[in-house]
Amino acid sequence: MFYRASLQASAALASLSLLAGCGLLSDSGSETDQKITVGTTSSPSTLDPAAAWDGSWELMRNVYQTLVSFPTGSTSPEPDAAESCKFTDATSMAYRCTLKKNLKFSNGEKLDAKAVKYSIDRIRDIHFKGGPVGMLGSLDRVETKGDDTVVFHLNKSDATFPFILATPAMSLVAPGDYRQDKIRDDGKVTGSGPYLLESYEGRKTAELKKNPDYKGFANRKNDAVTIRYFEKSGDMVSALKADEIDATYRGLTAEEVVSLEDNKDDNAGLQIVESTGADIRFLVFNPKDPAAANPAVRKAIAHVVDRDALVAKVYRGTAEPLYSMIPKGIAGHTTSFFDTYGDPDVAKAKSILSEAGVTEPVKMTFWYTTDRYGSATEPEFEELKRQLEASGLFKITLRGEPWQKFQEGFNQGEYPVFGRGWFPDFPDPDNFVAPFVGQEPVTGSPYVNKEITQQLLPASRQESDRGAVSKQFERAQEILVNDVRLLPLWQGKLYIAAGEDIGGGERALDPQTVMQMWELYRKASW
């Protein structure tokens, strides 16, 4: 029978899963190998952590290892490759980690303090545009003490630094296989994570096999995972129904989720696991473009866009309108864009443009990625185009590109207006503001605001109680609303669709909404 599971009921579901059969596999072994096939529309743009600040993390979390990470059920970083980590001073400016003993990479190299330093320094040395180097702004230097101890010296207080180290971008790599000055692009991985990457065919498949030398917190409930990458979510759903894949992650459209839930008779043997998402979608305005650089144009768009209609028509209850760059459920969330711009108001938008001397329809090109966020992205932008042109104030041209080319384009400043999605690096308001401001934001379009970068963010990072930073982030959102360099659209939900014989889906998403493949297993009857 078809059923829908909520992560809020994960404890009960986990118990039911254990009762479902005797074939649950753990790292202690089982009589038969467990192999799982997972489908997704989100293929990696790179296999090198030094270049990854995107959905490539989904694969990296499973084949690399970080010093600290998020065990299932935890929202605070805990040791993984490290035996222990802690701040050694009251100002949160020195973070010391001691490694587990006898760690090694898949090529046999020793994973010691020097390898850790090499991995982190390499991110800064390569300085890949749009990559994770922007996350290391508070890092001054990395010091090794013997083979098993590494100390991160910060240039300012940063209580979020352990969260940063827990991201797949900070994955540890084997120095012998990764150059200090160049991104690795041979389609291979040399890590120390839960799985080995046996083979990889870009945009098609990744074959993972349990790493026999892994030493970390992941209790692997399967022996091998095949990840299939689909360009269209419809093909992915068809493969699920045909038992060609066991589960899907990332890319289901709203229509597909609703169809799977409503047509129970046609979808017997399938289940949906729903997670409250912290992922957001927003527009980015590039100041290199004359129209996008005009504050009046940006504010007029903010007055015209109808989020309720967008969510209702395109996402059908699988998302909700977002009026802040910080989503619901995260400390510091406000409704600042609604408070300022209110409900859609074409007359107000026209007045703003007229006062700025704009009397003709504004011609603009909106760009979006065709494959990163699922098949609904195209109809989403068609709906935005419809709304803006219906106002009589805009003439919109739409352009779509596959993620890799799209990423190159926005990093080179080629797109005047483009859509981005953001899946949090970690569940903290800092991660919904800091990545988008400064000289090297993840959007590729420099957005310098000294009050945010030099006052508000530094003040918030001195506070170890992350629930007590709302004041700074409320002010930051006021600035974002006034500038309208970023326009939040909606906040999503995450869904895993799987065969009814697949367990672990309710535990497979970490706080970064990254799929932990090791949680999936095939149930067996008694």
Report each predicted region and the residues it spans.
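Detector for C-terminal structural segments
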Residues: 31, 201, 304-332, 376-383, ...
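Alpha-helical secondary-structure segments
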Residues: 111-119, 149-153, 193-194, 222-224, ...
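Extracellular/periplasmic solute-recognition and catalytic clefts
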Residues: 141-143, 198-209, 226-289, 312
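N-terminal lobe/hinge region of extracytoplasmic solute-binding protein
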Residues: 39-90, 121, 190
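Structural transition elements
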Residues: 321-355, 372-379
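Ligand/substrate-recognition segments at binding pockets and active sites
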Residues: 354-424
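Surface-exposed binding/hinge segments that line
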Residues: 96-98, 133-177, 199
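Gly/Pro-rich hinge or "lid" segments in bacterial periplasmic/extracellular proteins
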Residues: 72, 166-219, 224
